[in-house]
Amino acid sequence: MAGLSGLALLMVAAWLVGSLLSQPDHQPVGAPPADWPVQTLQLPTDEDGQVRGWFAKGQPGHGAVLLLHGVYADRLAMLARARMLHRQGYSVCLIDLPAHGESSGERISFGLVEGAGVRAAMAYVRQQLPGEKVAVIGTSLGGAALLLSHVAPGPDAVVLESVFPDIRQAIDNRVRAHIGWLADVVTPLLAWQLPLRLHLELAQLRPIDHVKALGAPVLIAAGLQDRHTTPAETRELFDAAREPKALWMVEGAAHVDLYDYAPKPYELRVLGFLDRYLGH
């Protein structure tokens, strides 16, 4: 009886944790920086939602970069990258993914529904800059949302930072980092909930299955000390991608903002990659 009671308590606790993990992360973003003139966006999505963001035009012919933040964040997480890229002449678009920041959305879906925001933003950028090349930088959830979005036409270059290949493994990594071997029990309970909460199958949340279909040069980056998306998983994602591709494993970095962690090496790697494939 005690064993059954313990199992019931564990299931209830896992259900409550699952509720917290998939809750929307709505929060006010506020006005754009006063010293950086941008257009404020409110874009309809093909999922009957609204995506909010900012767009700043760069120099003609330099191309554009769409920036996609990680989970439980918003466009402000990509602001430093956006300003750096804009200084180099790129047009930049940064959005709040669905269920984040000021965008609509009832549940965080770990990439699938967030893909609607990617499609809306890409369509807007291409409409604003006809004939120019467009790159995407996606961190963690943002990169997964791009891979799961099946956006067409697709980007001309892609930077994926700390992107999980498979949601089940991503859950296990995060749970195991906090409670060790108990993840053997808790991970299956959390993974079991996702289809019930989000009306999808776990097989739909495997970005690794879609990286080969990008059809664009890709730079894949992650920290060598990342316990959420391990170096082995990052290499699996890299191996699944088509050429041309590049891999950057950042010494000493965990699952962190790689630009904040190593700004100069980041600029060297990412700007070199974008300049090469956007024809800057």
Which ranges hold each PLM region?
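Hydrolase active-site cap/lid region
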Residues: 148-203
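Short beta-strand/loop motif that positions the catalytic acidic residue
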Residues: 213-215, 220-222, 226
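Conserved alpha/beta-hydrolase "acid-adjacent" motif
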Residues: 227-233
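Catalytic histidine neighborhood in serine/cysteine hydrolases
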Residues: 238-256
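An N-terminal hydrophobic leader/cap segment in hydrolases
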Residues: 2-44, 51-54
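Conserved alpha/beta-hydrolase
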Residues: 82-104
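Catalytic histidine-centered segment of alpha/beta-hydrolase-like enzymes
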Residues: 253-267
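Catalytic nucleophile-loop/oxyanion-hole region of alpha/beta-hydrolase
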Residues: 100-129, 133
